[in-house]
């Protein structure tokens, strides 16, 4: 490895004019450039810097205290909690149906996956079977949000390495998909689309055709992004062999999702423990070999192709039918029944005021979210509110491993490594 150089190419381990080669100068020593010198010598080889939380590369929610030897990271400590809202406790103070808006604020880039994960946990506890059409709609919207999440990561990662064009292309594609989701569920970001027993709304007329047309455009944009980055010398040099994690280390550190698969472990919950209709769909699980930042980028690119494939199959297989269970102990009755019958009024009143009565018990349910395994541990005492709710955030193990992934690497390697794990503050800090 070449020797690390400080600012201006000066070797911080032997700076002229310091208190001695490699020694820390006395407190208060001022270093000034001499006549004819462009840079002042660095006063010490050791430096501790604060990166974030206001630094744009830290996405506003994470502080990293980094100890450097020249430009080499010797140690890093993470300071989190800037986005903590008390998610779990908040959910224990509302009815089961009122939890969904809180889940929207976990991974806010792919919120429908959070909705679906919580709904599946409650349905598993209540032993509730949902209609087939609702299953397909959940998969379609989840995979659309998976593409949006990966587009955001690829665009932000490229932008923070200097490729602004890629970011703009990614945001264009993401906005096209978000517009379709807004037409379906009324919101681009915080969707609140899933319901216990089904989904909130069916597809509006012409929505399938418009979505397929948008997917064609997204495919073209994604291919153009690949052409810009896959053989880009600068992007490859910044990402290849940086932030490496072996398969064994990834498993020991608790990695799941694209970061685990990039390290060579072919584990995907959609295949390992299929839910909804994933067992009826034909799609592949991409697996990396190097476990570095470039593999994690390639993993997202290939997963977008597989999500596109899944969505198109769902449109082909989905048949007309109900979108939510017709059991008014769990689902609100339709408005004609509420306005026209006393039974409908009573069912509506009890669900809104008291909440769904979920049978007493506890369950852990897990799904394959954009960043890995999203798990909900739910405890019910038979009342209308969760007695206890615990969340397994997929991004936390990767964030906790960041000091291990970056130790001994250059400070500049921290940026693509942080981007490639896709730490979302909403889900990690809850």
Curated annotation (Swiss-Prot):
Gene Ontology molecular function terms on file: NAD binding; NADH:ubiquinone reductase (non-electrogenic) activity; quinone binding
Lineage: superkingdom: Bacteria
Stored Pfam families: Complex1_49kDa (PF00346)
InterPro entries the UniProt entry points to: NADH_Q_OxRdtase_suD, NDH1_su_D/H, NiFe-Hase_large
Main location: membrane
EC number(s) recorded for this UniProt protein: 7.1.1.-
Keyword Ribosomal protein attributed: no
Subcellular location: Cell inner membrane
GO CC annotations on file: plasma membrane
Region (Disordered): 1-36
Catalytic activity: a quinone + NADH + 5 H(+)(in) = a quinol + NAD(+) + 4 H(+)(out)
Topology within the bilayer: Peripheral membrane protein
Keywords, in A-Z order: Cell inner membrane, Cell membrane, Membrane, NAD, Quinone, Translocase, Transport, Ubiquinone
Gene3D superfamilies per UniProt: Cytochrome-c3 Hydrogenase, chain B
NCBIfam families named among the record's database cross-references: NuoD, PRK06075.1
Subunit structure: NDH-1 is composed of 14 different subunits. Subunits NuoB, C, D, E, F, and G constitute the peripheral sector of the complex.
Family statement: Belongs to the complex I 49 kDa subunit family.
Function: NDH-1 shuttles electrons from NADH, via FMN and iron-sulfur (Fe-S) centers, to quinones in the respiratory chain. The immediate electron acceptor for the enzyme in this species is believed to be ubiquinone. Couples the redox reaction to proton translocation (for every two electrons transferred, four hydrogen ions are translocated across the cytoplasmic membrane), and thus conserves the redox energy in a proton gradient.
Protein name: NADH-quinone oxidoreductase subunit D 1
Species, as recorded: Anaeromyxobacter dehalogenans (strain 2CP-C)
Species lineage: Bacteria, Pseudomonadati, Myxococcota, Myxococcia, Myxococcales
């Amino acid at each position: 490895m070449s020797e690390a150089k400080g600012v201006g190419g000066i070797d911080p381990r032997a700076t002229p004019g310091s208190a001695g080669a490699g020694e820390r100068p006395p407190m208060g020593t001022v270093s000034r450039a001499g006549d004819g010198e462009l840079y002042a010598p660095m006063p010490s080889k050791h430096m501790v810097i604060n990166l974030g939380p206001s630094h744009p590369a830290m996405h506003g929610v994470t502080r990293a205290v980094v100890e450097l030897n020249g430009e080499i990271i010797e140690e890093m400590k993470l300071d989190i909690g800037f986005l903590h809202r008390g998610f779990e406790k908040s959910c224990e103070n509302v009815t089961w149906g009122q939890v969904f808006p809180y889940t929207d604020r976990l991974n806010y880039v792919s919120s429908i996956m959070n909705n679906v994960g919580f709904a599946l946990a409650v349905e598993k506890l209540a032993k509730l079977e949902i209609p087939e059409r609702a299953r397909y709609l959940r998969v379609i919207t989840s995979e659309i949000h998976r593409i949006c999440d990966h587009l955001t990561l690829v665009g932000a990662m490229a932008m923070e390495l200097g490729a602004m064009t890629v970011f703009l292309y990614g945001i264009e594609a993401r906005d096209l998909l978000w517009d379709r989701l807004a037409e379906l569920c009324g919101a681009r970001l915080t969707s609140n689309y899933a319901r216990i027993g089904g989904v909130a709304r069916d597809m509006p007329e012409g929505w399938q055709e418009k979505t397929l047309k948008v997917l064609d455009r997204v495919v073209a944009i994604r291919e153009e992004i690949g052409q810009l980055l896959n053989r880009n010398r600068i992007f490859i040099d910044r990402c290849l062999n940086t932030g490496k994690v072996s398969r064994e280390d990834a498993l020991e550190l608790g990695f799941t999702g694209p970061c685990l698969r990039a390290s060579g472990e072919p584990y995907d919950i959609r295949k390992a423990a299929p839910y909804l209709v994933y067992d009826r769909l034909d799609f592949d699980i991409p697996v990396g070999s190097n476990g570095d930042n470039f593999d994690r980028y390639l993993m997202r690119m290939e997963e977008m192709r597989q999500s596109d494939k899944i969505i198109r199959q769902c449109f082909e297989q989905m048949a007309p039918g109900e979108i939510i269970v017709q059991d008014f102990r769990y689902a609100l009755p339709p408005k004609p029944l509420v306005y026209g019958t006393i039974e409908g009024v009573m069912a509506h009143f009890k669900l809104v005021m008291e909440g769904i009565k979920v049978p007493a018990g506890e369950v852990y349910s897990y799904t394959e979210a954009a960043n890995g395994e999203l798990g909900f541990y739910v405890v019910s005492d038979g009342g209308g509110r969760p007695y206890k709710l615990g969340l397994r955030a997929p991004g936390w193990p990767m964030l906790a491993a960041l000091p291990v992934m970056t130790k001994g690497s250059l400070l500049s390697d921290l940026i693509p490594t942080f981007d490639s794990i896709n730490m979302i503050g909403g889900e990690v800090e809850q």
